Amino acid sequence: MKKYVGIAFVLITILIFTACGSNKNGSNKKMVLPKAEEVKEIDIMKNTSEDGLKIENQDEIEIIIEGIKENTNDTGRESVNDQPTNINDYIILKFHHKNAEGSPSVVYLYKDKNSHYVEQPYAGIWKLREDTFNEISSHLIK
């Protein structure tokens, strides 16, 4: 009888530890963006246009990167494609690294159902504050 109580205790303990470890929906993972000093330039363009804007000013690069990092909240949703699906209009940000020519990191900004999002391919989807979205998209209007 003591043997069964001991086994039950061990199994319940394992169950408790594994249940506490799964926090998929409540995760608060942070977006991984390059450091501003490692970025040579940022290309900003709409998916519907070939024309875009190239930002090379280091202060502007830092404002954009920090703005995204500080104003996003994890949605818990996964990104499983190279670009957003079922979204007709989005903004592409390409971060060109100083030491990695030809291989920029990419994020997508878009609006869906009155909310604004940042999607990093295969890393996740984050909710973005509206004012930050508007500030970044205003670069395309200049």
Task: Please report, for each region that a protein language model flagged, where it lies by residue.
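Secondary-structure "cap/kink" motif recognition
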Residues: 26-49, 124, 130-142
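Solvent-exposed, acidic/flexible segments
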Residues: 54-61, 86, 126-129
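C-terminal motif of bacterial Sec signal peptides marking the signal peptidase cleavage site
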Residues: 15-19
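Short, structured surface segments that line ligand/substrate-binding pockets
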Residues: 74-114
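Short, well-ordered, aromatic-rich surface patches in folded extracellular/luminal domains
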Residues: 97-142
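Positively charged n-region of N-terminal signal peptides that target proteins for export
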Residues: 1-11
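Bacterial signal peptide processing site
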Residues: 21-24
